[in-house]
Amino acid sequence: MANSPHGGVLKDLLARDAPRHDELAAEAETLPAIVLSERQLCDLELIMNGGFSPLEGFMTQKDFDGVCENCRLADGHLFSMPITLDASQQVISDSNLKPGSRVTLRDFRDDRNLAILTIEDIYRADKEKEAKLVFGGDPEHPAIKYLNTKVEDFYIGGKIEAVNKLNHYDYVALRYSPAELRVHFDKLGWTRVVAFQTRNPMHRAHRELTVRAARARQANVLIHPVVGLTKPGDIDHFTRVRAYQALLPRYPNGMAVLGLLPLAMRMGGPREAIWHAIIRKNHGATHFIVGRDHAGPGKNSKGEEFYGPYDAQHAVEKYREELGIEVVEFQQVTYLPDTDEYKPKDEVPAGIKTLDISGTELRNRLRTGAHIPEWFSYPEVVKILRESSPPRATQGFTIFLTGYMNSGKDAIARALQVTLNQQGGRSVTLLLGDTVRHELSSELGFSAEDRHTNVQRIAFVAGELTRAGAAVIAAPIAPYERSRKAAREAVSGLGGSFFLVHVNTPLEYCEKTDKRGIYAKARRGEIKGFTGVDDPYEAPENADLVVDVSKQSVRSIVHEIILMLESEGYFDRL
């Protein structure tokens, strides 16, 4: 029999509210609506299907404060991650939302009504408390970045009535709700289930450690990867799921099943490990593997880990009895070539030869097309990874030129376009500042916010083209550091490489060589908000390349850019 849910009762709101579907659906059409973001959709799905039991809605302030301060809901239940619905003051005011109001929660993807929320309270989001107590306070932490840049200023708490399931069009047969997975376990006759959480592809070592964990406990394996939001730069879930499916036949017959979890990860380390254990308990698992630096975001810009390597294991162990799910500590295994087997590192005698490939080395081999040995990963898995991660010489990239008007950006961009077209191998797209203003941003002015929006539109186009394998050359003025950082994140977040080139031509030179007289007009006050005259240009903090047309020829600058790309592997090496 599957493990009992957290809190004793599976809060399957979809099943609970199904008899009232027509009534709720009709009411939802008459209510004001909040259109949910991708992360909010992930949270709502797991609230409605019981994955977040005992939650029945988004957290009130009492729940939020208790979870942040003590990992406790207001009713005393253990819960480690704030699950909140953020909204702007404008949305709240426009819809006249207040305690007691009912509001429809709507899917941004297809405009479907998903649920009705009865508002219990509206409270200001204490982002500082959440950042410090839940995630550790480092402003570079991805969850804290999200808090500070994406989350609105108010949280809305209240219980939910389910109207419709979210629509999914990928891997539908693998998207088990907690109730469905419990039925599946019963059908298979499984009573002991070891759940394995992952957001990465699995290789032979992962197969070995999960089999060992199951064998030691006379259990079966639930491979339960996250297919919601993970860490920026992770391999997309389509590729990962194909790789998991290819791996599944390598398990002993009937030992493992694959189920997909639509979770929006926060990369919250110890707090997240407790949360993951609760979620797996709700899905019926009796055991849960917690790895080294479980759900950690890696290192900050100083090379420091956000969490200690065993903080997550210690956190889950602290609440072992209350969680009601047995923690299985992730064993680091290594390959022994002399005996062609994997063993836990702490069981390998001194002097025995071992082999390992790090994640960084694997990415490098995928990037360069270098051999990936069968002792590390199965050929069918490697084939799938290579299909989605072609060698860098065939990948796209974005060259983002920034500098004053008339600094030489356009000349460099055009010359670079010709050079790359001559090189061949990928399509080349040119996004000049004036062209973008005319074709994409004609309605925008030159306020700070409009300039930021213009750069983000460029980044969106560049990211999509780069992901498709094109070379993109963008050449806006882009005077603000926050806009350039956001552009880099947008392109990198889609898996593309972004190179920031600061065309650091002095303002005096730009003015002196301005044949159109634009600077002169700005000096006379005929043009307002002109970069370098009455609006600042913030020099980039971390440019990949700095050039200067007053000291270098366009030809030599283009050569520098080509050399930079060549050193990063973007051209075939004979």
UniProtKB/Swiss-Prot annotation:
GO term, biological process aspect, one: sulfate assimilation via adenylyl sulfate reduction
Catalysis performed (reactions): sulfate + ATP + H(+) = adenosine 5'-phosphosulfate + diphosphate
EC number, as in UniProt: 2.7.7.4
Keywords: Allosteric enzyme, Amino-acid biosynthesis, ATP-binding, Cysteine biosynthesis, Cytoplasm, Methionine biosynthesis, Nucleotide-binding, Nucleotidyltransferase, Transferase
InterPro entries linked to this entry: APS_kinase (IPR002891), ATP-Sase_PUA-like_dom (IPR025980), P-loop_NTPase (IPR027417), PUA-like_sf (IPR015947), Rossmann-like_a/b/a_fold (IPR014729), Sulf_adenylyltr_euk (IPR027535), Sulf_AdTrans/APS_kinase (IPR050512), Sulfurylase_cat_dom (IPR024951)
Class of the enzyme per the UniProt entry, highest EC level: transferase
Residues holding 3'-phosphoadenylyl sulfate: 434-437, 451, 477-478, 516
UniProt-annotated catalytic positions: 198-200
Residue numbers marked as site, Transition state stabilizer: 203, 206
Binding site for ATP: 197-200, 291-294, 333
GO-annotated cellular components: cytoplasm
Record region (Allosteric regulation domain): 395-574
Keyword flag Repressor: no
Region spans: N-terminal: 1-169
Signal peptide boundaries: none
Localization, UniProt: Cytoplasm
Pathway: Sulfur metabolism; hydrogen sulfide biosynthesis; sulfite from sulfate: step 1/3
Keyword flag Nucleotidyltransferase: yes
Entry binding sites for sulfate: 197, 199, 295
Activity regulation remarks: Allosterically inhibited by 3'-phosphoadenosine 5'-phosphosulfate (PAPS).
Subunit structure and binding partners: Homohexamer. Dimer of trimers.
HAMAP family linked: Sulf_adenylyltr_euk
Function: Catalyzes the first intracellular reaction of sulfate assimilation, forming adenosine-5'-phosphosulfate (APS) from inorganic sulfate and ATP. Plays an important role in sulfate activation as a component of the biosynthesis pathway of sulfur-containing amino acids.
Family named by the database record: In the N-terminal section; belongs to the sulfate adenylyltransferase family. In the C-terminal section; belongs to the APS kinase family.
Domain writeup: The adenylyl-sulfate kinase (APS kinase) is non-functional. It is involved in allosteric regulation by PAPS. PAPS binding induces a large rotational rearrangement of domains lowering the substrate affinity of the enzyme.
Name of the protein in question: Sulfate adenylyltransferase
Species for this entry: Aspergillus terreus (strain NIH 2624 / FGSC A1156)
